[in-house]
């Protein structure tokens, strides 16, 4: 769980209150308690059993080392966070102030193995084919560059380590950052934030919803803390410090910036609604029964009853050819689609085209030189699906390497390819 500078600018500027074809897919009604699969033609390999969708193992060490005692200034912030959240720490928190250079090194070390690089390369190929990032984007480097310029602190639920940029005698802005991370630590002790790591891969939208819950709580709590503890002059200092940092580097595509900032923008509004409905206890209940889609975060009135259907794009690797391999599966939610539309359309049209989403997924394949992507999305009604299909056609413009298909009353399939030869093949197989 990380706090980013752009998030602080957005927070402080606002107000916080108390994916030859087979048969046409069949769309099941929106369930109220469990997900229903929506599948297309060809032989279906469920995403949840796909090798690309392995759950990330969580190894929380039994002994994470002595916590020690917090410096008095840190302890005071922790006590105030307890008061705002109506919770108490069950064990001491290890908090460490570090330099920017040390923070970047810690994050580099945590990235670790080659798997994140390989996964990012596959995602980059799929996203470039869809058209949300430029071709040739090094997504791993883009994320690293973004974090190196924007991350101000983090709390690691696996090691229970809290780190922020600052000193042991923190000023107002550093204490503001500390209050955010201390909220994560408090939530972790009561609700176990490693839940995020245990979510199976390929459940990207559900992960985004959970991150929005956690970051939303931390943002709201830190703002309430600032308003209670800081003087008017200190609040001005915090706002100035938040706005004085560097913008994201040019290596970071706009789509990625928006994707990474989403939890800090939509999450607080979701938390505000919970507070208005039931106070801090409603936030606690949300951690026990988290939102399962970014739709629920964007539309709190749809939480918790409006659950998504499970859309599974057929695995077309064998139909594409002997050299083709599956490279990526991603759950596509309202947030992702709204950000896609926002690259070329107005924010109003982006929101309208992605509203009343019911479920979605894309799958991507490559033979090394060519890439194919199929995105299936389910909608609450034919009207919503038709609006999405029309919006996608507008978004694609005169692109010759993509096709939008209305394949059911409330199901839309979009085909993307890296080149004309591949889109012709994909249309024959999946069109």
Q: What kind of region is each of these model predictions?
A:
Residues 79, 251-370, 376:
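Pan-zinc metallopeptidase signature
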Residues 188-194, 198-238:
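Post-HExxH zinc-binding segment in Zn-dependent metallohydrolases
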Residues 104-121, 136-162:
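Catalytic zinc-binding patch centered on the HExxH motif and its immediate surroundings
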Residues 162-179, 206-209:
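Short pre-active-site segment immediately N-terminal to the catalytic Zn-binding motif
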Residues 16-19:
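C-terminal motif of bacterial Sec signal peptides marking the signal peptidase cleavage site
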Residues 21-23:
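Bacterial signal peptide processing site
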Residues 358-431:
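C-terminal soluble interaction/assembly domains
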